[in-house]
Amino acid sequence: MRHFMFEDYDTGEEFLVCACDIEEAFIIARDYFADPSYICEVDEFEAESSGLDEY
């Protein structure tokens, strides 16, 4: 699985989505936030050490 970082425009919250590809990650992000914006892909270490919520 890959880790994708997003930011929600409405709340300003940054969060991670664990998914197979960016399309799946967007679907998951939209399930939890109204207006998510993709930032970048991070590796396993960055995801674990970021302290961000992961969906």
Language-model segments: which ranges?
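Short aromatic-glycine-(Arg/Gly/Cys) micro-motifs in beta-strand/loop hairpins
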Residues: 1-13
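Short, mixed-charge low-complexity intrinsically disordered segments
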Residues: 31-55
